[in-house]
Amino acid sequence: DFHTHHLDAPAGSAIVNLPLEILSGATPFAPLPDARYSVGVHPWWSSLPPAELAQLQQQLLLWAARDEVVALGECGFDRLRGDWAVQEQLFPLHVRLSEAYSKPLILHCVRAFDRLLALRKHYRPTQRWVIHGFRGRPALARQLLQADFDLSFGEHYNAESYALTPPSRRHIESDEGRLPIALLSTPTIERPEGFNEKV
């Protein structure tokens, strides 16, 4: 399970995305042995007061260095929710941490693929950028794959987009729902060469 919000996922079975209350420090949290986590400032949180956002960024710096954190994100852009200008300000920090700690970037993207494509071209990252919960059409999937993005597929997905994505570039996730059973039965899911061994 490449990306889930279920904190009770069995240790080692998933990359668990830590929620706002844990990242902010409002809720005490002790990572489980052998568990794997991702941390990031979600674009929906971009409407929070500036002081809270500053605190989140400080906490992100601390969490990103931890061994049990194997990915940054989810982060990214959402044209329908949150403060776009703040989302633009938050994104570079995630890229820097992803590169500094050699951890992939898990991306939330709603109606902003043009921006992500431009940013990938600008940064030329060495780490994988993975679009989570991808449900776009084949034309968009091809465009993203050609730009070197990975795609992660969840409960709702475009079957043709999934089929055209090379096994080494696709992932499956439950997000806030369930793992897609049809994809679980597909034997071609592989660990990408060179991908973080903990992922």
Region roles according to the model:
Residues 1-199:
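Mid-domain alpha/beta scaffold segments of enzyme catalytic cores
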